[in-house]
Swiss-Prot record:
Compartments (UniProt record): Secreted
Family according to the record: Belongs to the glycosyl hydrolase 35 family.
Top-level taxon of the source organism: Eukaryota
Lineage of the species this protein comes from: Eukaryota, Fungi, Dikarya, Ascomycota, Pezizomycotina
GO cellular component, one term: extracellular region
SS bond list: C205-C206, C266-C315
UniProt-listed SMART domains: BetaGal_dom2
GO molecular function annotations of the record: beta-galactosidase activity
UniProt binding sites for substrate: Y96, N140, A141, E142, N199, Y260, Y364
Name the UniProt record assigns to this protein: Probable beta-galactosidase A
Annotated organism of origin: Aspergillus fumigatus (strain CBS 144.89 / FGSC A1163 / CEA10) (Neosartorya fumigata)
Length: 1006
């Protein structure tokens, strides 16, 4: 069938002229460009109607997970994440690009090594995953500046508006990044099928024009001019209808919105607030964008967590498997055709890339943990939903109806939303009317079916909806030509294996279920017990009823085998596509879905392919695991698991069975406390002999920052001088007149920041930080000063990233870092002359491999001593567990070897002992990558996962710590250790380490 392409905005900016016309196809409206030549460009790739996207002419539900490649700086691990998302039944990944990491200096775009996008596209294609590209320029994303580079603080214009200075500042970045994305589009054989200009462009204040069609059109034109031809989609922060098709200038092709309905209160993970379940999304969609598929571009899959928060384990408990059952099935009840879950894999805010509202971990409570584990129950639950949608193409043809408490269920305690098919199958989404309910509610259903309206169960008993659960009951569900008249048990998947069909159904504990199949054959139980089971033949319909049990039953009706499972059992089932070879996995399509097999195998099944007479599975195991293959192709005779030929048995139902033995290797990790630690004082700036003549002078009379006027004689805003990340150090020189007794200083570093102040070598005090304080005014008493003598104030500030810029017009990202104001008693402010430093070179940053944000302004960082093989041979031997006896900062470095056996995925963590003693701050560097900021008095993070590829699992590693003692009695680490969690026997390919350039003497380092 020929499908013609659509462009609400022309395929290229030069093609903007030309009206749209409408066609009808199978009763659905398609939009297409009026110029046939322009239609041809996309006709066989990506089109859409009001029901769904079409990719290569095939209607497809986009089930997507959010992944940020910049939060996992090991490109050879990206395939692992993609395969784990593919195994969920998903077919797409959405990704942000962080501008701040690619254009650290205005006009110099660098997207190489860990920051290159092409390898990300390559492994997406290898895994058979489509991509939704979201390069901003603004991304939010809990990233420093919301993805804006720090030098935008100097732009004389309002951010995210039509202000010419801002637009010009974005041109270089978008021209480059969009051109790279364009090369990865499906039109060029790549995986990119959608492109999102801007991000959550949904609200403004402060007299900013909003919505500004000229601005959005500019961002759109930037993309089109760079070669973007796939459809453009947006993510309104709520159902506001902003920039939807038909709104005029700046409209996108497909309207989408975001939703985080449960909020972010991880401190109360069991609390579901009243009224937070969306109920109007369908009617909102019909008002705002009825000609496009209903699209949820960010739907909640976890939560951020602030400094001092309860931790991401609590966030995973808040947005858990029960949340998924209730909220994601609710999304499906609205007819969601593009559903992207934020985040599906969170990763790490390594190298200072996060904003002040979060700490190093960006685990997010996601289905995949920060260390890429799939052990959370929410991953398994999501796999049930994802594979159901993948196996149910008629879902996209069903029309969502209005939710109701009558007409379907026999109790008003339950709400049912119908999705009615026109001879193509119907779906009934059942939930508690009070969605927060934890009650178990019995019910019966009245269902309209091809056999008439039926009251279910027909064979007696009642159905049960347990608390915080939801069901999708199918009606007239097509299983390869066999009509399932209804099933109250939920569908995991089904397959047609030629000589037989398989349907897998499941239910929760304590539930009773029933299904009816349009088939003349008798019902046979071919595996499992007949107890708590009954069946009845009614004409040409077989009705089966059973109580859910942990023991598997297989029922055969004609050529259909129906597996009756409990939910915990089906968690162990996987549906890998059957590929032609081991080089790549095909994109999800009718063909690849039909060719899939079913494998029961525990922890993870990655891929399946045939070669000659062999069936090859790649899978991971974390325990001795029984393995079953259901639907092995008739032309294969041998089974290979992770390349090893494996003996198996075949039972009477044609199921292959074997067992994979698991014997964890002994992982011997070095004791961190026993390493040969070398120590260097890295706050040499407070020594009386220190010379700061090479430092940049803070001598600007004015600031280009348009947000906050100066309240100091010279600008002390760090970004005015090109310093946007990590620790800042200021040195203020003055000649005393003897009247100076106190020093007031207001510093700003973002939430949970800290600062310390010295006068010459005398420690004055510290602000140890609170999450609630982005800035703080401190007053310090000075020791007696001598008239006519030179003094130096040294101020150390830990910056926590730049603010995001979510509300247009606030220019919140321009909130400066550094010193906002100060007062030296008895003196004019101009009596002090200032110098400052951050990372060496500022925007001319030294380490092009690890990027512009990785290192800050400490002496050891400026010298590059945090990198492997520093010149530490003559340094003092001292351990961070002995620590410092007075305020200051110590730098510690050591090397160690690892010998982790290949073939095992072994997550490693650096753990700090949690102290209630004096406040201190630690930066953790691993092979030159900053992989942790530990704040002892705020927390919550004490455990820092570091992936293979940053750590060398077979070879030498360097670890470095900066220990900042903020109080007068100094500080030491209570404990510091390297630990592992359960080794996973893995089919992962060999992990190539990210580049780890060693220390080299830096020209001009001070």
């Amino acid at each position: 069938m020929k499908l013609l392409s659509v462009c609400a905005i022309a395929l290229l900016a030069a093609q903007a002229a030309g009206a749209s016309i409408k066609h009808m196809l199978n009763g659905f409206t398609l939009m297409e460009h009026s110029d046939p030549a322009k239609r041809e460009l996309l006709q066989k790739y990506v089109t859409w109607d009001e029901k769904s996207l079409f990719v290569n002419g095939e209607r497809i539900m986009i089930f997507s997970g959010e992944v940020h490649p910049f939060r996992l700086p090991v490109p050879s691990l990206w395939l692992d994440v993609f395969q784990k998302i593919k195994a969920l039944g998903f077919n797409c990944v959405s990704f942000y690009v962080d501008w701040a990491l690619l254009e650290g200096k205005p006009g110099e775009y660098r997207a190489e090594g860990n920051f290159a996008l092409e390898p990300f596209f390559d492994v997406a294609k290898q895994a058979g995953i489509y991509l939704l590209a979201r390069p901003g320029p603004y991304i939010n994303a809990e990233a420093s500046g919301g993805g804006f580079p720090g030098w935008l603080q100097r732009v004389n214009g309002t951010l995210r508006t039509s202000d010419p200075a801002y637009l010009k500042a974005t041109d270089n970045y978008i021209a480059h990044v969009a051109a790279t994305i364009a090369k990865g589009q499906i039109t060029n054989g790549g995986p990119v099928i959608l492109y999102q200009p801007e991000n959550e462009y949904s609200g403004a204040c402060c007299d900013a024009t909003f919505p500004d069609g000229d601005y959005m059109q500019y961002v759109i034109d930037q993309a089109r001019n760079a070669g973007i031809v796939v459809p453009l989609i947006n993510n309104d922060a709520w159902t506001g209808g902003h920039n939807a098709p038909g709104t005029g200038k700046g409209e996108v092709d497909i309207y989408g919105h975001d939703s985080y309905p449960l909020g972010f209160d991880c401190g109360h993970p069991s609390v579901w607030p009243k009224g937070n379940l969306p109920t109007t999304f369908r009617t909102d969609h019909l008002k705002q964008s009825p000609t496009t598929p209903y699209s949820l571009i960010e739907f909640q899959a976890g939560s951020f967590d602030p400094w001092g928060g309860p931790g991401f384990a609590a966030c995973a408990a808040l947005v858990n498997h029960e949340f998924e059952r209730v909220f994601y099935k609710n999304d499906l009840s609205f007819g969601a055709a593009i559903l992207n879950l934020y985040m599906t894999f969170g990763g790490t805010n390594w190298g200072n890339l996060g904003h002040p509202g979060g700490y190093t971990s960006y685990d997010y409570g996601s289905p995949l943990t920060e260390s890429r584990n799939v052990t959370r129950e929410k991953y398994s639950e999501l796999k049930l939903i994802g594979n159901f949608v993948k196996a149910s193409p008629s879902y996209l043809l069903a029309t969502p109806g209005n939710l109701t408490t009558s007409g379907y269920a026999d109790t008003a305690d339950l709400t049912v939303t119908p999705l009615l098919g026109n001879g193509t199958g119907s779906y009934f989404v059942v939930r508690h009317t009070d969605y927060t309910s934890q009650a178990s509610t019995p019910y019966k259903l009245s269902l309209p079916t091809s056999a008439g309206r039926l009251t279910v169960p027909q064979l007696g008993g009642t159905l049960t909806l347990n608390g915080r659960d939801s069901k999708i009951h199918v009606v007239d569900y097509n299983v390869a030509g066999t009509n399932i008249i209804y099933s109250t048990a939920e569908v995991f998947t089904w397959k047609n294996f030629g000589d037989s069909k398989v349907l897998i159904l499941y239910g929760g504990p304590g539930e009773h279920h029933e299904l009816a199949v349009s088939f003349k054959s008798d019902v046979q139980v071919v595996e499992g017990s007949n107890s708590e089971f009954k069946s009845k033949k009614v004409g040409d319909v077989a009705v089966v009823a059973w109580d859910v049990s942990p023991s598997r039953r297989i029922v055969q009706i004609g050529d259909l085998k129906i597996f009756l499972l409990d939910r915990n059992s089906v968690y162990n089932y996987w549906v890998p596509q059957l590929d032609k070879d081991d080089s790549s996995t095909g994109y999800s399509s009718e063909k690849t879905t039909a060719s899939s097999i079913i494998v029961k195998a525990g922890y993870l099944v990655r891929t399946a392919y045939t070669k000659g007479s062999g069936l090859y599975l790649t899978a991971d195991f974390n325990a001795t695991t029984p393995v079953e293959v259901i639907g092995a192709p008739s032309n294969v005779r041998n089974l290979y698991i992770n390349g090893e030929k494996t003996q198996f048995k075949t039972d009477k139902n044609g199921i292959w069975s074997t067992e994979v033995k698991y014997s964890a290797p002994k992982i011997k990790l070095p004791s961190m406390k026993d390493l040969d630690w070398k120590y260097l004082d890295t706050l040499q700036e407070v020594q009386s002999t220190y010379d700061d003549s090479a430092w940049p002078a803070a001598d600007l009379d004015t600031t280009p920052n348009t947000l906050r006027p100066l309240t100091t004689p010279k600008s002390l805003y760090s970004s005015d001088y090109g310093f946007h990340t990590g620790y800042l150090i200021y040195r203020g020189h003055f000649v005393a007149d003897g009247s100076e007794t106190t020093f007031d200083v207001r510093t700003q570093g973002g939430s949970a920041f800290g600062s310390s102040v010295w006068l010459n070598e005398s420690f004055l005090g510290s602000w140890t930080g609170l999450n609630a304080n982005a800035d703080y005014n401190s007053t310090y008493k000075l020791p007696q000063v001598e008239q006519g003598k030179n003094y130096v104030l040294t101020i150390l500030i830990d910056t926590m990233g730049l603010n995001e810029n979510w509300v247009v017009g606030t220019d919140e990202m321009k909130n400066p870092r550094g010193i906002l104001s100060y007062k030296l008693s008895g003196r004019d402010a101009s009596a002090i002359t200032w110098k400052l430093t951050g990372n060496l070179g500022g925007e001319d940053y030294q380490d092009k491999i690890r990027g512009p944000l990785n290192e800050g302004g400490l002496y050891a960082e400026r010298q590059g001593f945090h990198q492997p093989q520093p010149p530490s041979q003559k340094w003092k031997s001292a351990s961070p567990l002995d620590g410092l006896s007075k305020p200051g900062i110590g730098f510690y470095t050591a090397q160690f070897d690892l010998d982790i056996p290949s073939g095992w995925d072994v997550p490693l963590y650096f753990n700090f002992g949690n102290s209630t003693k004096s406040a201190y701050r630690v930066q953790l560097y691993v092979n030159g990558y900053q992989y942790g900021k530990f704040v002892s008095n705020i927390g919550p993070q004490t455990s820092f996962p570091v992936p293979q590829g940053i750590l060398n699992y077979q070879g030498t590693n360097w670890v470095a710590l900066t220990l900042w003692a903020l109080e007068s009695d100094g500080a030491k680490l209570d404990d510091f250790e390297l630990v592992n969690t359960t080794p996973v026997m893995t089919a992962l390919s060999k992990i190539r380490p990210s580049k780890q350039p060693n220390y080299r003497q830096r020209k001009g380092a001070y």
